[in-house]
């Protein structure tokens, strides 16, 4: 993918079309959770914690396998204007439910739940500050928090084998001003003609592709270009995950 001056200067951030936002993972961010990570993707900041619960949902009792699930939420002032807490409204929005199910599915895709035993790994992803890509940052950070929780279980002797089979990470891609771009911030996300969230494993397999035309359509060729950008971006994110765990 070209990184010419034209490619760079036309993005609000000045990034090349194939460039991620500045990205970091800060492990051990909170004291009590078995795993905790503050993930920063540009101005999107998400706190991901992993809690080990010595129980499983009723549908898994007695089956000798575990469960990985997730919850997602945004602080009231994570965005430009204050939003009410969903607890105060008495119910979760459809968006929240969709995102937390996506996070759970993405993590379960790389777990051998039989090796986890009859326990639950509960991931909480709380958006401290949102500037686009919160669900993708949540998945990428939650995997590191989960890895730390599993490492603690193995250190304690509660697990004989590591149930994590592969890494998993996610990134957004989209069409902005007729071009495919990687890792959209809020300004780009608000103006894009297509928005695609891509979840992949460290070995390069797809877990999920969520793509939507935003008042427009996109071609197979444009989708292929966006997926190519996503593959490159996720490879970088997986490297960052593995480096953070060293």
Swiss-Prot record:
Recorded superkingdom: Bacteria
Pfam families documented for this protein: RNase_PH, RNase_PH_C
PROSITE patterns cross-referenced by the UniProt entry: RIBONUCLEASE_PH
Gene Ontology terms describing biological process: rRNA catabolic process; rRNA processing; tRNA processing
Record-listed E.C. numbers: 2.7.7.56
Annotated phosphate binding sites: 95, 133-135
Entry keyword Endoplasmic reticulum: no
Annotated function: Phosphorolytic 3'-5' exoribonuclease that plays an important role in tRNA 3'-end maturation. Removes nucleotide residues following the 3'-CCA terminus of tRNAs; can also add nucleotides to the ends of RNA molecules by using nucleoside diphosphates as substrates, but this may not be physiologically important. Probably plays a role in initiation of 16S rRNA degradation (leading to ribosome degradation) during starvation.
The protein's assembly and partners: Homohexameric ring arranged as a trimer of dimers.
Name of this protein: Ribonuclease PH
Organism: Bordetella pertussis (strain Tohama I / ATCC BAA-589 / NCTC 13251)
Gene name of the record: rph
């Amino acid at each position: 993918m070209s990184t010419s001056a034209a490619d760079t200067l036309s993005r609000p951030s000045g990034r090349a079309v194939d460039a991620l936002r500045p990205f970091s993972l800060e492990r051990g961010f909170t004291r009590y959770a078995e795993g905790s990570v503050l993930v920063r993707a540009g101005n999107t900041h998400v706190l991901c914690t992993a809690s080990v619960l010595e129980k499983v949902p009723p549908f898994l009792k007695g089956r000798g396998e575990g469960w990985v699930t997730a919850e997602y939420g945004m602080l009231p002032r994570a965005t430009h204007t204050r939003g009410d807490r969903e607890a105060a409204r008495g119910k979760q929005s459809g968006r929240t439910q969709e995102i937390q199910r996506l996070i759970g599915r993405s993590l379960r895709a790389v777990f051998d739940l039989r090796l986890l035993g009859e326990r639950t790994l509960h991931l909480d992803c709380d958006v401290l500050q949102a500037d686009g890509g919160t669900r993708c940052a949540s998945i990428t950070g939650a995997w590191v928090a989960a890895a730390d929780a599993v490492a603690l279980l193995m250190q304690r002797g509660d697990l004989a084998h590591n149930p994590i089979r592969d890494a998993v990470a996610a990134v957004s891609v989209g069409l902005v001003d007729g071009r495919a771009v990687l890792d959209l911030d809020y300004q780009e996300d608000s103006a894009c003609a297509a928005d695609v969230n891509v979840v992949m494993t460290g070995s390069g397999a797809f877990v999920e592709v969520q793509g939507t035309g935003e008042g427009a359509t996109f071609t197979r060729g444009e989708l292929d270009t966006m997926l190519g950008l996503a593959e490159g971006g996720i490879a970088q994110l997986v490297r960052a995950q593995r480096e953070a765990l060293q």
